[in-house]
């Protein structure tokens, strides 16, 4: 009504829209060292998988691959990841619900493909802070790009807000899951010591 106080505080957006737009690209996904990031949303409602590729030359690329309600289970994710173990360096998986089940499905000695030690990463708070810091640095330096047709990813990026974590900050807000998954994927690609694409390039 008339007497409702005016809210004057502004949301502390994590990624300025102009910074995000400056890194858009119409180029196809490059070839190179690949990693996946999986984020289960804070409210437990959805899960998002993103990919990151670091080519030998040129900027890295982040892309959203899929997002689905957690009510559909995690078998589709496990199948996707198990099929790509031989081409990806690692997968970084974070969230409250569904993580344990997914990790079991991809590392189980009978059904899982992810055998290499350290190829499945469950980030701590310090890792999350580092992943966000890395993505922000890469955006600022324009050393990472996103595919221009990925409007849902753009929406997540430019509406995410700063969420305090353990002395640093991560992405928060109602739609931060996609950009969180991208940050995890890029962090995995940058920090993993495993790179199956190197073997593929020999000869």
Regions inferred by a protein language model and the residue ranges of each:
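ATPase catalytic-site recognition across NTP-hydrolyzing enzymes
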Residues: 1-37
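Short, flexible loop/turn elements at secondary-structure junctions
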Residues: 2, 39-44, 53, 69, ...
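Phosphate/oxyanion-binding active-site loops and adjacent basic polyanion-contact surfaces
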Residues: 12, 45, 69-77, 95, ...
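Gly/Thr-rich phosphate-binding beta-strand-loop-beta motif of the actin/hexokinase/Hsp70
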Residues: 28-55
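Short, conserved catalytic/metal-binding motifs centered on acidic residues
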Residues: 39, 49, 91-94, 181
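Short, Φ-rich (hydrophobic/aromatic) sequence segments
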Residues: 42, 46-50, 128-139, 183-185
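Mg2+-dependent endonuclease catalytic cores in nucleic-acid-processing enzymes, primarily RNase H-like
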Residues: 56-167
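Charge-patterned, long linear interaction tracts outside catalytic cores
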Residues: 162-203
């Amino acid at each position: 009504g008339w007497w409702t106080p005016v809210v004057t505080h502004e949301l502390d957006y994590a990624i300025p829209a102009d910074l995000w737009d400056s890194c858009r690209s119409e180029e196809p996904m490059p070839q190179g060292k690949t990693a996946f990031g999986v984020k289960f949303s804070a409210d437990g409602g959805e899960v998002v998988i993103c990919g990151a590729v670091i080519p030998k030359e040129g900027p890295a690329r982040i892309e959203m691959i899929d997002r689905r309600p957690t009510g559909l289970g995690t078998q589709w994710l496990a199948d996707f990841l198990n099929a790509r173990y031989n081409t990806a360096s690692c997968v970084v998986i974070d969230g409250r619900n569904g993580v344990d089940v997914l990790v079991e499905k991809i590392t189980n000695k009978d059904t899982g493909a992810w055998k290499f030690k350290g190829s499945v990463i469950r980030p701590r708070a310090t890792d999350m802070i580092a992943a966000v810091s890395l993505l922000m640095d890469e955006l600022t330096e324009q050393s990472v790009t996103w595919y221009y047709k990925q409007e849902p990813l753009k929406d997540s990026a430019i509406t995410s807000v700063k969420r305090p974590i353990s002395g640093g900050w991560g992405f928060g807000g109602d739609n931060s899951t996609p950009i969180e998954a991208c940050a995890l994927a890029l962090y995995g690609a940058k920090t993993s010591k495993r790179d199956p694409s190197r073997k593929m390039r020999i000869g």
